[in-house]
Amino acid sequence: MSELKQKQVFKEKVMHSEEEDVSPELNTQKTFSEKETFIPVEIEEQQKETEQELQLEQVIRPKSGRKWLTTGLFATFAGLVVWQAVDSVITAIQTADWLALGWVGFITTIASFGLGALGKELWKLRKLRNHFSVQEESEALIDSQSVGKGKAFCEKVAEQSGVLAENPGFDRWKNSVNPAHSDAEILEMYDSMVVSQQDKLATKIVSQHATESAALVAVSPLAAADMLLVAWRNFKMIDNLSKVYGVELGYASRIKLLRSVFVNMAAAGASELAIDASMDLMSMDLAGKISARAGQGLGVGILTARLGLKSMALLRPLPWYPERQVKLGAIRKEVVAKVASITMKP
């Protein structure tokens, strides 16, 4: 008896019928409407979050205000002072009151110095307003698709910023520009070749003042001295940054700029805290374990760095480009290293 199995014959009709019974809908055509297409919900949410962060990081500039009202009040006050001085001189000469004439001359001299100082402050305040208008104009050129305005605009910005024609970056930018470039491309090249050099100097200034403020607060035993010291260092930092970007500041314009910086820090606080809160808390915890004064110094250093970066954003002639924007993380590392080196010394 053979151990081999007998052959089995399968019919095609049976196979087809079985296949049809198992999967009757495999060959059926099915169309999808637009409502049934796949939608990447997570990507959209990430894009919305990114847009919200960018909106928070935008620079908030002060409003122009009533320029004509301020100029009119100053002109009226100056006219009244001159009128009063001339009338007093004529009256003193007619009555032969030489003592009154001397007092009139003395008071007129003091008033002229005061008017000159006030006029100088108003002029510097006007230049600061013009600087903000230049920033707005640069943003409009970057967002537009125009051609032919970018080179003249950048040359005007270079003149206002005190960039010399012999500057290597400015000379390289002029040689790189050709008529085929759009205004946005010309401004991007100017930012990468000229403004980036100013950014490097400004970043060094911010880093230096932040680390020095943190170190001074960490070793200072007096809270009142800390407050005065930090305020003086911050004003000095803003003055140095304004010189780097060629913005001349007076007393009134310095106060206006500082107020604008605080407004920007408050507006962007939510976004920055969401990004940097963990690192700040980690740094504060590290310094707090070493000493309480080190923790205070580290907090002051980070606050000074934030103040400096917001000042840079307001003093730059062009808006930040994301790939070249100075981040707080690099400066924070230097502040932490400085405070740690001071507090860990035996």
UniProtKB/Swiss-Prot annotation:
It holds the Pfam family DUF697. Its main location: membrane. The keyword DNA-binding does not apply. It is a multi-pass membrane protein. InterPro entries: DUF697, UPF0283. Belongs to the UPF0283 family. This is UPF0283 membrane protein VIBHAR_01918. It comes from Vibrio campbellii (strain ATCC BAA-1116). The lineage of its organism: Bacteria, Pseudomonadati, Pseudomonadota, Gammaproteobacteria, Vibrionales.
